[in-house]
Amino acid sequence: MKKYKKKIIITGALGQDGLILSKLFIENKFKVFGFVKKIKKYKLKNVKYLKTSLTNFSTLSKKIKYINPDIFIHLGTDNPNFLETKKKYSLKKNYKIIKNIIDFFSINKVKTKIILIGSSQMYKKNGLKINVNTNFKPQNSYAKFRIKSHKYMMKCKKRFNLNATTAILFNHDSIFRNKKFLIPRIAKFIKQKKFNELKKIFFENISGDFSHAEDICKGIYKLALSKKNPNKLIFSSNKRTFINDIINYLLNLSSIKIKFAKMKRKKYLSSIGNNSLARKELNWKLKKNILIAAKELIKINI
């Protein structure tokens, strides 16, 4: 019989970050339980997947009590960008789930390490570097939900002495990234030689903070193991990347001799995440970058 160091629950365990984190914990002898909406064909061998309704407090509570996890990472949030027709319902549902999770650990006084996820969209687009002391200024209703969730966590953290942190994540990609996002779309357009679609993206001259998802997940992993209990930490690349540089890199990598007209690099409003506190507190280092993620995406069948 295998001996495990600790037990961890990961919601949304079949998403990009859930898969990467599950692998990390399995490699380090953790017993991993994945709470999912439905069991997919692609899953990891050593993860115990449980179809779970996170909106049902009673059902959720019973499963958490039974497992008695040392760590709980909540990744299972609907992205309203893909559910525009159901945005209000989606955000209300997302908040109910967060509240259920926090309420369980508050009521039962369980000293589990809790990690919630935040977004760069919680901050104003000002072209500057965002740090943990920057005031929230939501860009959209999704960001408002994230801020509301963080504030509720903080309220309960102070009252019930929870070990809880909001990990604020900036853009990060890998081969597991949802194909509707920008970098996977670019890789797909290049592989399918859809240069008109590529040109449209090129002329938007987008820039922002982009990382390899494995780096971001390694930071979350280190946070999960840390004895420290910060209120929030930023996980980002700490630098600005221009999407046009990624496009040109992938075109060159694919031996496609096509050039779009050079454009002036405008002063874009997208902000950059200052990850210095996370690096210091967790001894976290970035070992990869977004170009490596893009290269990996172009090599797989999308």
Segments (PLM) and residue ranges:
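Rossmann-fold cofactor-recognition segment
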Residues: 45-56
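Short-chain dehydrogenase/reductase
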Residues: 91, 139-147, 180-184, 209-210, ...
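NAD(P)-dependent short-chain dehydrogenase/reductase
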Residues: 128, 151-209, 213-217, 221, ...
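NAD(P)H-binding glycine-rich loop region in Rossmannoid oxidoreductase-like domains
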Residues: 54-93
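C-terminal "lid/loop" region of Rossmann-like NAD(P)-dependent oxidoreductases
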Residues: 199-205, 231-233, 241-248, 255-270, ...
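Amphipathic terminal alpha-helices
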Residues: 2, 290-302
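Conserved Rossmann-fold NAD(P)-dependent oxidoreductase catalytic core, especially the SDR/UDP-sugar
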Residues: 72-74, 99-140
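N-terminal Rossmann NAD(P)H-binding glycine-rich loop of SDR-like oxidoreductase domains
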Residues: 8-27
